[in-house]
Every structure is written in C-alpha cells, then in structure tokens.
Amino acid sequence: MNIFYVHKDPVVAAKMLIDKHVVKMIIESAQMLSTAHRLLDGEQYEDRTKAGRRIKRWRLKSKNEEAIIYKASHVKHPSTVWVMTSAYNYFWLYKHMIALNDEFMLRYNHTIPHMTIRKLKEILKYPPKNISLSTIQTDPTPAMPDECKIPGDVVGSYRKYYVMKKKEMASWKAPSQPPQWYTEGVENG
C-alpha cells in the first residue's frame, strides 16, 4: 500500500510511474478510497476471517455501495490515513487513480478500462459524507525507508525512493518514457 507521490499534479504523477505501478496502483488507490468510505461513513462490526480469526469490518448503509465498494484494508497505513484526512486529499487520489487508468490503457493498448475502474469509477467519484471539507490538502506521509526521506520534501523523497529502491523493476512501455529526474538520478547514482 502506498501513494507514489512523484509529482504534486495527480495526472503528471501517474504518467511518471513505472509500468508495474501503473497497473498495481489502480487497485491500491481504489482500496484506499473504498476504505475511506467504509471507515468514515460505515458502521463497525466484528466478523470472522475464513481462518476463523476475529476482524473489524465496516458496513455501509447503502446496499448498493455495500455490494460494490471494496472491503476496508490497511486502515492504519499512513497513505490510507492521509486519504481520510480531507476531501482534497481524497480528490487528489481519485484523480490519480483515473489518470493511472488512462496511462494503463495507453501503455498496454487497451480499449476497455481496468476492471477496478469499470466497477468503482462512478461510486468513488464522490468523497465520503463524513470527510472533512475544511481541512486543506496536504502532501501524503512518505511510506518508505528512512534513507530515502528528504525532510520537508515528499515529492523529492518519492523520487529518491524510485531511484534507490525501484531500479530493478523500472520500465516504461512506449510511448511513455522515464521522467528526466529518474534518468538523471540513476546516472548520478
């Protein structure tokens, strides 16, 4: 679970992500947005996992939403907490998720959106009813090793994280290309 905040603009950030993250982060973004709905607007109850363990869950009042929105996941993860802090943060991630899908369709030559987008685009378009509208947008909390963090610079931290820790899996399918900051970071080692 993460938000690869490599640019403050959610669309530009999506274009800069490596191929693997373009696909994977559509699902993770939808999980965080869904979790925001469940925790902020849902009613908590106790359930059991398939293995019989007790687990906290949140039920939505709307049967339509309950049937469609993903289950709550990683409820204490810094990225999930960030999404739930304000409507502005929520909208940033929603726009990023849509841009990731556009990038997915472009890079992989798909004419049909990712399954997650087909299922959740409309229902996640609006933030939870109980999310703060008065809290301004903030940068996400960096979720990465300390050695990658640059104090006071979340974008720089995520870029450094990409250069230091994601090199082995870094690829950009044409027509996309690695961002300049990435190629310079790898060259300068």
Residue ranges and their predicted role:
Residues 1-76, 80-189:
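Sequence termini and other peripheral, non-core segments
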